[in-house]
Curated annotation (Swiss-Prot):
Superkingdom of source: Bacteria
Protein name (Swiss-Prot/TrEMBL): Putative ankyrin repeat protein RF_1099
UniProt keywords, alphabetically: ANK repeat, Coiled coil, Repeat
Pfam families linked to this entry: Ank_2
ANK repeat coordinates: 46-75, 78-107, 136-165, 170-199
Record carries keyword Repeat: yes
Listed GO biological process terms: positive regulation of protein catabolic process; protein ubiquitination
PROSITE patterns: ANK_REP_REGION, ANK_REPEAT
Keyword S-adenosyl-L-methionine recorded: no
Length: 267
């Protein structure tokens, strides 16, 4: 009997997790991708495992089953842990379950700036810092400003996050990111909250000087670090996106005008 128990324990601890690990793969699907105001049909790769499928299907019972079979609650698949899938799907119920099963928030791969406000608020209430700074010097609020996520901006402001914090490498503020990408509503929210528009980045530029800089500039292959569509795209598609984007000569002058008006009204 003891031999059987030892064998079963060995299978649960070593064999099943190994099988699950082998199931980790990159699944490609076609999505609408937005790069600097242009929309593309692009194949996007997502790390896929059985637990990821269960989370996407909102199947809590299947998630429980997979974990009970020995899949690690913090086991990564191409950098993603199960909690990342719950965050990506804005699934508070499963995120809560994973945390109760000892999922570590320190292993979260997704920048808070990519999160929807609901899941971000839940995680912050569970102890995640709203002031996280990432390797490129950017904060969650800066990325939310770049990605045009006013709801998350409002949440972070409500929680006391300082909107005047600067990127530790470039000196840019959240207001500069919002102005650079012509995100009118984010600019409005930040200015109404009393953000300082006169802060200078490390090259001496104020937020007013950043209006439409990224929205209008030409793309380069190195931008793959910042644009998910370029980062995930095959080489030929990457070149196609860059070529098409750089051939566009029109500017969104209405948004530029609206943002300048907002700056003038908050001097």
């Amino acid at each position: 009997m003891k031999i059987i128990q030892v064998i079963l324990k060995f299978i649960i601890i070593f064999i099943i997790p190994s099988i699950h690990a082998q199931e980790c793969k990159l699944e490609f699907k076609t999505e609408k991708i937005h790069v600097n105001g242009v929309t593309y049909d692009q194949k996007v790769g997502d790390p896929i495992t059985p637990i990821a499928d269960a989370i996407k299907a909102d199947n809590l019972e299947e998630v429980k089953k997979i974990l009970d079979e020995g899949y690690g609650v913090n086991q990564p698949c191409l950098g993603w842990v199960p909690l990342d899938y719950a965050i990506s799907n804005n699934n508070i119920k499963i995120a809560d379950f994973l945390l109760k099963r000892d999922a570590s928030m320190s292993l979260i791969h997704i920048n808070i700036g990519f999160m929807k406000s609901e899941i971000a608020e839940f995680l912050i209430n569970q102890g995640m810092s709203p002031n996280l700074r990432y390797e490129d010097g950017i904060t969650g609020m800066m990325l939310a400003a770049e990605r045009n996520n006013p709801d998350l901006i409002k949440l972070l402001l409500k929680l006391g996050v300082n909107p005047n914090v600067q990127n530790s490498k470039t000196g840019m503020t959240s207001l500069m990111y919002a102005a650079s990408y012509l995100n009118v509503e984010v600019v409005r929210v930040l200015l109404e909250q009393g953000v300082d528009p006169n802060i200078k980045d490390f090259k001496g530029k104020r937020a007013l000087n950043w209006i439409a800089v990224d929205a209008n500039r030409k793309l380069h292959a190195s931008d793959g670090e910042y644009y998910a569509a370029l980062f995930l795209a095959p080489f030929e598609t990457k070149q196609k996106i860059i070529k098409e984007r750089n051939s566009i000569k029109t500017r969104n002058k209405e948004k530029e005008k609206e943002i300048k008006k907002l700056f003038n009204s908050h001097r």
